[in-house]
């Protein structure tokens, strides 16, 4: 069902290097990052949902300059009975 592409990144779990992907999507034409889905497209879900959302939100706000919080939204989708975090990154504003 899910397959990585230039606009779709799959992550088994939250890892700090996800910020590189957020920046890359904002600097190009945007994309989505699904956290809780492995590289083969298998839905695993997120175990520490609230903790991971808070870490992710804080990392995007505090670590990326200029601020891109207006271009990145964090959502939770229920897929195959599992909670998955979706980071929807829009194309950033040109400088």
Spell out what each predicted region is.
Residues 1-95:
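Conserved N-terminal catalytic/coupling substructures associated with nucleotide/phosphate chemistry
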């Amino acid at each position: 069902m899910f397959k990585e592409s230039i606009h779709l990144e799959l992550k088994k779990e939250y890892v700090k290097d996800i910020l590189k992907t957020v920046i890359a999507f904002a600097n190009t034409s945007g994309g989505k990052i699904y956290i809780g889905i492995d590289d083969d497209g298998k839905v695993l879900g997120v175990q520490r949902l609230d903790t991971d959302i808070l870490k992710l939100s804080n990392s995007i706000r505090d670590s990326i300059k200029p601020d891109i919080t207006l271009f990145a939204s964090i959502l939770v989708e229920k897929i195959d009975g599992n909670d998955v975090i979706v980071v929807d990154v829009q194309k950033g504003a040109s400088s």
